[in-house]
From Swiss-Prot:
UniProt subunit comment: Probably part of a tripartite efflux system, which is composed of an inner membrane transporter, a periplasmic membrane fusion protein, and an outer membrane component.
Record lineage: Bacteria, Pseudomonadati, Pseudomonadota, Gammaproteobacteria, Pseudomonadales
Membrane topology term: Multi-pass membrane protein
Keyword flag Iron: no
Main location: membrane
Record-linked Gene3D superfamilies: P-loop containing nucleotide triphosphate hydrolases (3.40.50.300)
Annotated ABC transporter domain residues: 6-244
Protein name: Probable export ATP-binding/permease protein Pfl01_2215
Length: 651
């Protein structure tokens, strides 16, 4: 005789309840050959369901040996047992155990997904099986739209999806009326005749009478194992499908990933309000991260733009030791010769002397106090000052102490008002008449007063005709592009120290101010981002809580999936994907909301704008994904660790 398909030797199964242990199965010896139709009959509590669970690899024996087609199952892990369930067994349950949110076709397809059958083939096979069972007109119906008999036929089709070499039917007619029950038994007899091994688990002798072999179980022991003569003709198993291969397992992993996304989407849209509330924390966190990053970048660019407007690559040299030095007014060592020496340095683009004083300006009957600055023709280049109209004075103007002046926008407005062209007009600076040859463009930045009045005259004119001062208040040096600011500053200090013989001056490097602004901006952005991260963590905890609830609500679904061949890794992947999808949707909404805030921001604040970067968006997406993985792991792990028998028993 051929080797048994299923062989149990000395199988025992014990359970612990508190301090007590009781045996559900006691030293069971049983062999079942391929193509047999066996009925396991017994009263409630006899151990027949426990025996069926062990046969179907849903449970494990406490002691003894169980071989499937010669393969010992005692030391197999959960993944190997799941593969055996998938490749050998098809389950038909008393309560059908169909997933309520899936159509008949998709319920039938489920085992083939875990077996790695490509979507077109499994879809065609599911339709074929349902058509053979008389359900060709109900392919897209959900379980709630089917009668009990129709649901059981869907369950039978699902059991046959992967070939169903062994059909395990647990009270297949228990929840059906007489007519539907007879129809189900007819189908099972046809399957047996087609070569399937059919194992019926029932308490009804009439159902058991359809089998060719009846095994009676009581108190965990086999009381009898007798033949029941019937006219049967075993045929080849026409429903057999190829067993899993490495290539099919790769296809399976891809199919499972897609299925996980599909199931996640169905779960999300089935509980819209709960999903929205779950995502709320993620939305707030991502909106905060992206918006804060955009605001910080916009503020930084605004400040740096203002610094660059006054010359970010400039170094100013002053008398004294530092700002506020009371002795600086008495130090008169900065002289035009220093400017000439600085202009000789190869890394200096230009250097200009600066002297200044508040003097009275007069035009007709208008008198104003303004800051009068004596500078060289290079000053406007050093400071990056543009002309609104006219031209700056030239080197020849400086040499001949020309009585010319450049005024700023505010001075033009205060002296001449609207409708008067200031170019060519003569104003008094102190007692010196000067001709206006240029108007500097308005320079709005955080470092200049919007109300200050400034005029510029050639240094030689200021020193010789206005102030009578030969020493300088300061020197402004513009660094050539590409030269390191700190190195240039050190060399300027060395030159000045060499010329003066003592440190009677100090420098102010605006590049260091820019670096300080950037550092402060980064620190502030980091602080605000940490606050945003806290909201993300809170949102992640919310995701974990809801996912834990979801696992509890879908316990029976998890049990069904395990019964049809899902491995622990498949279940874990499905719930992880669901958590990640929730977080990614929340992240997408958060990013969109940030851009909407940026648009509103630009409508109300004209001076500067929020600057969104690809980096901040990618960071938001990565954060969403990581939160989904980190906070979805515990619920996913809990789902994968569920016992399939306990899960199937949940309502």
């Amino acid at each position: 005789m051929s080797e048994p398909l299923l062989q149990l030797t000395g199988i025992s199964r014990s359970f612990t309840a508190g301090d007590r242990e009781f045996l559900a199965l006691k030293n069971i010896d049983l062999t079942i050959h391929a193509g047999e139709m066996v009925a396991i009959i017994g009263a409630s509590g006899s151990g027949k369901s426990t025996l069926m669970n062990i046969l179907g690899c849903l449970d494990y024996a406490t002691a003894g040996s169980y071989r499937i087609n010669g393969r010992e199952t005692r030391d197999l892990d959960n993944q190997a047992l799941a593969e055996l369930r998938r490749d050998y067994f098809g389950f038909i349950f008393q309560r059908y155990h169909l997933l309520p949110h899936l159509s008949a076709v998709h319920n039938v397809e489920m085992p083939a997904i875990y077996a790695g059958t490509p979507e077109p083939q499994r879809h065609a096979r599911a339709r074929e099986l349902l058509a053979r069972l008389g359900l060709e007109g109900h392919l897209t119906h959900r379980p709630s739209q089917l009668s009990g008999g129709q649901q059981q036929r869907v369950s039978i089709a699902r059991a046959l999806m992967n070939g169903g070499e062994v059909i395990l039917a647990d009270e297949p007619t228990g929840a059906l009326d007489t007519t539907s029950g007879k129809e189900v038994m007819r189908i099972l007899l046809e399957l047996h005749a087609a070569g399937h091994t059919v194992i019926l688990v029932t308490h009804d002798p009439k159902v058991a009478a359809n089998a060719e072999r009846i095994i009676e179980v009581s108190d965990g022991e086999i009381l009898s194992d007798r033949r029941n003569e019937r006219d049967t003709a075993a045929l080849s198993n026409e429903d057999a499908v190829p067993k899993s291969t490495a290539a099919r397992r790769l296809v399976a992993s891809l199919g499972l990933f897609k299925e996980a996304f599909n199931m996640a989407w169905v779960a999300l849209i089935s509980h819209r309000m709960r999903t929205l509330l779950t995502m709320l924390g993620i939305v707030i966190g991502i909106t905060s991260v992206v918006s804060i990053s955009a605001i910080g970048e916009g503020a930084k660019r605004y400040v740096l733009k203002d610094i660059q407007a006054i010359g970010s690559n400039t170094i100013d040299i002053y008398s004294g030791t530092s700002f506020g030095d009371s002795r600086s007014a008495a130090i008169e060592t900065l002289v035009p010769a220093d400017v000439t020496a600085l202009n000789q340095l190869y890394y200096v683009d230009s250097a200009t002397p600066v002297v200044g004083r508040n003097l009275l300006l007069r035009y007709r009957n208008i008198d104003l106090d303004a800051q009068v600055n004596g500078v060289s023709d290079l000053y406007f280049q050093v400071r990056g000052i543009k002309m609104e109209s006219g031209i700056p004075f030239s080197e020849s103007d400086a040499r001949r102490q020309a009585q010319v002046v450049v005024i700023d926008h505010n001075t033009r407005h205060r002296l001449f008002g609207e409708g008067v062209d200031p170019l060519g007009q003569v104003i008094l600076i102190g007692n010196l008449p000067c001709t206006v040859i240029g108007v500097a463009a308005e320079n709005k930045n955080i470092f200049s007063s919007s109300k200050s009045l400034n005029v510029w005259v050639p240094y030689e004119t200021a020193a010789g005709r206005l102030l009578g001062q030969r020493y300088l208040d300061s020197i402004s040096v513009r660094i050539k592009d590409g030269q390191p600011s700190k190195v240039v500053e050190d060399n300027v200090n060395k030159l000045m120290l060499q010329r003066h013989g003592t440190k009677d001056f100090f420098t102010n490097n605006l590049d260091s101010v820019m670096q300080t602004v950037q550092k402060t901006s980064r620190s502030l952005a980091l602080l605000l981002s940490l606050i945003a991260v806290i909201s993300l963590v809170v949102g992640g905890i919310g995701v974990m809580n809801i996912m834990l609830v979801s696992v509890t609500e879908r316990t029976r679904e998890i049990g069904i999936r395990m019964a049809v061949g899902a491995r622990q890794s498949d279940i874990r992947q499905q719930f992880l994907v669901e958590a990640v999808m929730v977080c990614l949707l929340g992240g997408a909404i958060g990013i969109s909301l940030s851009y909407a805030i940026g648009h509103l921001f630009s409508l109300f604040i004209k001076e500067w704008e929020m600057v969104f970067s690809l980096t901040s968006v990618l960071t938001a997406v990565i954060c969403s994904t990581l939160i989904g993985i980190v906070f979805g792991f515990v619920p996913a792990r809990n789902a994968s660790r569920l016992d399939p028998i306990e899960a199937l028993a949940r309502d």
